[in-house]
Amino acid sequence: MDLQQDVDLLRNIPLFRNIDSAKLKLLAFTSERLTFQPEENLFLQGDFGDAAYIIVEGDAAVLIITPDGDELQVAAVRQNDWVGEIAILCDVPRTATVRAKTKLVTLKISKDIFFQLITQFPQMSVEVMRELAS
């Protein structure tokens, strides 16, 4: 995939929908493309949240550990969804485990890069506040 395709993908995420293309290009350029195999975890519930992931292709399960210690699937995510945003936006441990159900291609957006962009581009801060309020 080229940079413009990554920008188009980011534009499909509500948080980034109203951000101009130049800022999205910078975000896409600084993101890391990662591939996960079926049953591979992107991250585990309780982990430190250092990044969010945008699903480029594939499907994943969002799982929580119940009080009995069992895994419970609470959501499914697919192309154009993003996961891990709560941990980077709210500075809390991961609230769930995300596990690939199929081969999964993601864009990993690091917390540091994300907040550098928010600092440099105030419009992104406004969009983050809108996302948190919804």
Regions found by a protein language model. Name each.
Residues E32, W82, D91-T97, K103-T106:
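Helix-loop-beta junctions that constitute the ligand-sensing/allosteric loops
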Residues R11-L63, D68:
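Regulatory nucleotide-sensing modules
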Residues P67-V83:
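Short acidic-glycine-tyrosine-enriched beta hairpin
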Residues D6, A22-L24, P93-T95, K111-S134:
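A small-molecule sensor/coupling module
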Residues V74, A87, T97-R99, V105-K111:
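Short hydrophobic beta-strand segments that form the core of ligand-binding sensory/regulatory domains
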Residues D8, A52, V74-A75, T106:
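A residue-level structural signature of the nucleotidyltransferase/glycosyltransferase Rossmann-like core
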Residues V62-L63, E85-I86, A96-A100, Q116-L117:
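Short beta-strand His + acidic residue motifs that chelate non-heme Fe in jelly-roll/DSBH
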Residues I19, I55, R78, K101, ...:
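A conserved hydrophobic position in a structured secondary element of the catalytic/binding core
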